[in-house]
Amino acid sequence: MYRFTDFDVSNISIYLNHVLFYTTQQAGDLEHMETRNYSAMTEFFLVGLSQYPELQLFLFLLCLIMYMIILLGNSLLIIITILDSRLHTPMYFFLGNLSFLDICYTSSSIPPMLIIFMSERKSISFIGCALQMVVSLGLGSTECVLLAVMAYDHYVAICNPLRYSIIMNGVLYVQMAAWSWIIGCLTSLLQTVLTMMLPFCGNNVIDHITCEILALLKLVCSDITINVLIMTVTNIVSLVILLLLIFISYVFILSSILRINCAEGRKKAFSTCSAHSIVVILFYGSALFMYMKPKSKNTNTSDEIIGLSYGVVSPMLNPIIYSLRNKEVKEAVKKVLSRHLHLLKM
């Protein structure tokens, strides 16, 4: 049997010390490298649609024109709902909230998008990306709740007109609008904080035209189970349950409209609800395509086009739809414009 001498024990001890030192040093270097990668994330590069350089100027002009239409149309709708006393009702109060929401939503995404279209670098700061995400998620969630609230308002107005002023009193409809904003802001804040706290491991190229949460999560190199779970629950509530409530409201509304004997009353009810239903189809159609379809590793051009539609086209069309489909809004617009034109002539 071999017996260890003092010399052997000394050599083994020295060898183990070297191994321990080398392992500790390697772990420290790795930890330092990871910390450096995590802390060095100060900006992101948005490369969505950059594979079509010949379209950058066209997209810039298109989005700029749409943005001006959004600001003009939604601002006009807000102004007439304030100035015209006939529009001081819950329905137009919610419509004013929707117009203000569309202005805020597009103002958070379109100006940075315009800069990126004309920029060679196509970068956005970490803070700017987080702010864009929290605003877009918050206002998107708020719009889901607000559209459901508007559907309930239509339901009460058509199915229970005699008690409408009692049910939709001033306190209730202001609280409903306020809670729409609060719920949207809280859900977006939670999702944004949980996403921006994740390690990106130096990968800062976002394959999208905005800081969209799904595109950003593809850059994460750690477990995103909690993020996916929260996003799934939020999407089910915002996109499925609320859409189902809107659908149920319209089933009752349609059955009540068909029982109206007066042709003029039936036409007015249809015109009021048709504008809201078109807005719901546009908004939820784009949102369901973006957030509920099977996800792929790479972002498709169709995803970016739908994202552009979701963030630009719908807010642009909302005031146009409500103006064309609503007689009271058209009359209020004519009244406000004629008054200002008369003042200009004087």
Swiss-Prot record:
The keyword Transmembrane helix applies. Residues 79-86, 153-171, 250-269, 325-346 are cytoplasmic. It is found in: Cell membrane. GO terms for cellular component: plasma membrane. GO terms for biological process: detection of chemical stimulus involved in sensory perception of smell. Glycans are attached at residues 37, 300. It comes from the Eukaryota. Keywords: Cell membrane, Disulfide bond, G-protein coupled receptor, Glycoprotein, Membrane, Olfaction, Receptor, Sensory transduction, Transducer, Transmembrane, Transmembrane helix. Belongs to the G-protein coupled receptor 1 family. This is Olfactory receptor 13D1. It comes from Homo sapiens (Human). The lineage of its organism: Eukaryota, Metazoa, Chordata, Craniata, Vertebrata. The gene is OR13D1.
